[in-house]
């Protein structure tokens, strides 16, 4: 075949990403596949040409040589006008993963048997206390999960025996069905696509190759986690099948509410009730933190609902050395009733409220505070 530019063959730009090149090749392979174009030498030539182009452009090293030197840079790989594949069967064998996924045709690299399958992911819902979330903790989880059967090592066959190759599909897990011009590969009904048959099942797992077990895992809870955060433990999910990798375990966090603190992002909110005398005259009050209590200055004239911010007394930011703040939300307590002496002082304050020196008003509230037992 003529040596056209490989990018032109696949219809992609020279800066095309790998997945774009793969998609373009799939499209060309579908268009010029021999089963779709029987007795068509031109389509077969284009099919081989697309395969040749894809074999170079999918490989980073080959692609770099081609970009620099053109066809001369990759002719040592067997290309050079005649194509790198002597037959369509060679192409099927070389790119069996693509054709198996895309077309389902038989004759793509021989009997490969069942493919490895990754194990399923697991989810574990973990409730932790507010303090555990704030400070971090190490907890032990008991996870019910399937594990590879220790008696048969996952084969499903009784100890001392081995699974047999399926006689119907020859171990490929597929059988061929002719549909018009197409040969479609279907899962073998005799072995259910496994490519093998267990004549003598393992007594322990009953041929499943897996048994259920309780696995204890030690998990570190980072400080600052919140409800909905997920911790991913790689490889701690269900075991893979046919040599596939295990799945992952996702620990989903739920943080219990706290009686003292309310969370606002990485800040903590705490309510502090003060008397109306403290609000007017100002005072020093003690408020709780996650550590020891701290003293907060309440300035004169503080209104109910005002918030005072104490930096560094909140929750740590995940993955950072920064820490949130403690937000002290003040609530001014108003007495529901007063005695005669208190009412007298309040009436006197009402008369003196305007156009009186502040010192006299301050003394008035000191008297009111003593009368109400707030000294």
Curated annotation (Swiss-Prot):
Source organism phylogeny: Bacteria, Pseudomonadati, Thermodesulfobacteriota, Desulfovibrionia, Desulfovibrionales
The encoding gene: dnaJ
Alphabetized PROSITE patterns for the sequence: DNAJ_1, DNAJ_2, ZF_CR
Binding-site residues for Zn(2+) 2, renumbered to this chain: 166, 169, 188, 191
Annotated Gene Ontology cellular component terms: cytoplasm
Cofactor: Zn(2+)
Protein name in the entry: Chaperone protein DnaJ
Source superkingdom: Bacteria
Alphabetical UniProt keywords: Chaperone, Cytoplasm, DNA replication, Metal-binding, Repeat, Stress response, Zinc, Zinc-finger
